[in-house]
């Protein structure tokens, strides 16, 4: 029995060592703004040619931080960078805010300024050796369309591969799975995502109930208001109110990041398989 236990202990120890070696990253840091230029030269593109670019904006988000659209994609990038073997470009924190720009602390960048700036960032990533550029977008509205357009232009002009992911839309089924209903801008899904990242950015005491929310126009295009009357915008009426449930927040974060990582790995694998 003692011999058996000794062998078992040795096996468990060996497995832990192998696991630790497997988990150890091949790069000292995945963040481009933290890595030294000499290590970057040794890593890109020989060890990785994939980069994650978080994009967002500054605008009100109910009872969470104004920079939620930046916080979410950057945290996601850090969570999935190693398993997608990707570097992380610095977050682009200013964007095309739209109908919430009148709220305190919000910033609005025009399309005329935003489009060429994003294009030069993508071109800079190509120049630095990246062939697969993944935009993790945290803000919707007109910004999503511009990112899609610019990413497509760069892919065609520079003969690289681009993928734009609007995480809240991509994870709509996970929202319904975890919360049992649809979500919203600064609603149950986005509030939970931020709560899982940093609960100090969430202020339940400031939530006064449904009067702080407004459902998006239904049917779409039936009405328009600027500024939008609430910073919590429900995708469907009477669904998506913030719940502040930590267990659901943690589960949701894991499901979303797992799904996004899976999409990236599958897409890059198929690009490679096709020789693109």
Indicate where each model-derived feature is located:
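Bacterial N-terminal signal peptides
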Residues: 7-16
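Positively charged n-region of N-terminal signal peptides that target proteins for export
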Residues: 1-4
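Extended, histidine- and acidic-residue-enriched regions that form the cofactor-binding/catalytic faces
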Residues: 21-86, 90-98, 104-112, 116-134, ...
